[in-house]
Design a protein with these regions (language model features):
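Glycine-rich phosphate-binding loops of nucleotide-dependent enzymes
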Residues: 1-101
Length: 101
């Protein structure tokens, strides 16, 4: 039986066997050990360096700030802001995530 982190790695590896150019990851590191998170982060970095686009969905702001080139913030299913890496702060993300449209 595989641990949760190893299960995540296997799932990502299966996706990589496909010839897709966009990978959508929804909370890919939730509930796994720090070491395994680091392994997944390194894998994602390698994939993006090779030209794969990754949509990374996470509720952990530090994770988003460290992993993303751009963050799209939503509230109740609507986009409230798009931030480039230079604009990332936890305060700005929180402000946009609670913004009413």
């Amino acid at each position: 039986r595989l641990s949760g982190g190893n299960q995540q790695k296997v799932i990502i590896s299966r996706w990589l066997l496909a010839t897709e150019k966009i990978l959508i990851l929804d909370e890919p590191t939730r509930g796994i050990y720090v070491k395994t998170k680091a392994d997944i982060y390194h894998l994602i970095d390698r994939l993006t360096a090779e030209g794969l686009s990754v949509i990374f969905i996470s509720s952990e702001m530090p994770e988003l700030i460290n992993m993303c080139d751009r963050i799209v913030v939503m509230n109740h299913g609507r986009t409230t802001g798009v931030l480039s890496r230079e604009e990332f702060t936890q305060e700005r993300i929180m402000e946009l995530s609670t913004k009413e449209l």
